[in-house]
Amino acid sequence: MESEVKPFLTESAVEYATQSIVSKTIIKKSTGTVTLFAFDKGEQLSEHTAPFEALVQVIDGEAGIKIGSNEYVVRHGEAII
């Protein structure tokens, strides 16, 4: 049975916590995963590799993103792959 398909607002699906990173898995399949992350100011993920390309979309504030040796600032409403 397939799960119910319906639109949702990303902003309302994100949960925030003080001094934490909160993650919420939306889809997890062998072909890829969609996970929402909420970072409190100053929180970060350690450098890592992943089996799939990653799309980062900033829905609130801004984020410093490092891809290889390049660093980017991604702001509210922007995305980077």
Annotate each predicted stretch with a short phrase.
Residues 28, 39, 49, 57, ...:
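Conserved strand-loop elements at the edges of beta-sheets that form or border functional pockets
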Residues 52-68:
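Glycine- and acidic-residue-biased ligand/ion/polar-headgroup-sensing regions
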Residues 36, 55, 70-72:
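Short, surface-exposed secondary-structure edge patches
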Residues 1-31:
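A short, N-terminal "cap"/entry segment at the start of jelly-roll beta-barrel domains
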Residues 69-81:
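Short acidic-glycine-tyrosine-enriched beta hairpin
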Residues 42, 61-63, 77:
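Short hydrophobic/aromatic patches on the structural cores and recognition surfaces of FHA
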Residues 20, 35-50:
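Conserved short histidine dyad/triad with adjacent acidic residue
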Residues 24-32, 45-47, 53, 59:
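Active-site region of the double-stranded beta-helix
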